[in-house]
Amino acid sequence: MRVVILFSFLLIFSCAQPQTKLPEYSTVLTDKERDIQNQMFADSWLNTYIPFSEMGTDILFSAADLCEEDDRIYSLGMNLGNENSAYESIREEINQSLGLGPKLKVVSLGTVSPAGKAGILAGDEILEIDGEKIKQGKNAFSSYIQKIDRKNRKLYDLKILRNSEIIDFQVRSEQRCRFDFVIDLDNNTFNAFANGDIMVFS
């Protein structure tokens, strides 16, 4: 009797086991899905960042008269970046979305900023300022900053690459509040404030 019961138990147990092989998951497919998710996140981040950066730039110029004299600087009003600028965790995806390479590119600019009023557009690449070439790669932004006089109003000659066309612009710097803006995208409740050092959109 024990033999029959034991045999029956083994038979039932064996019948309960999977009778086919488990599916083999493709690592190529999962890597592709991960890349798609990362790209979607980066695009979502940009869709939030760019409008707020445009708004922030306009506010800094429009509110210049409200800032103390010591809290004003001269600027052209362009938010610039290249392939080394984005957060490392989404850098590859940001570079893909914006077409960023070693050259310094206009990511956004305000409508009332000097560059915006002069006709410069997001996507333009900065090649030269006053006949001096802008460095490429990791030193691109510092190369640009060194050529901008923060203390005095000045007319600049800019050489821009737009698509495959090189265009010359003249842009006169204007005063803006010296502090910059920070965009915190981890907060689900919108808020905006300035503390004298930075302006925060969250």
Which positions does each model-derived feature cover?
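Sec-dependent N-terminal signal peptides
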Residues: 3-12
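Bacterial Sec signal peptide processing site at the extreme N-terminus
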Residues: 15-35
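Acidic/histidine-rich, surface-exposed loop or edge segments in extracytoplasmic proteins
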Residues: 28-43, 196-199
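PDZ/PDZ-like peptide-tail recognition elements
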Residues: 46-104, 170-187
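Sec/Tat-exported extracytoplasmic proteins
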Residues: 56-67, 119, 130, 148-149, ...
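Conserved PDZ fold ligand-binding element
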Residues: 115-140
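PDZ-domain C-terminal substructure recognizer with occasional recognition of PDZ-binding tails
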Residues: 142-182
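Polar-ligand-bearing catalytic/cofactor-coordination segments
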Residues: 180-202
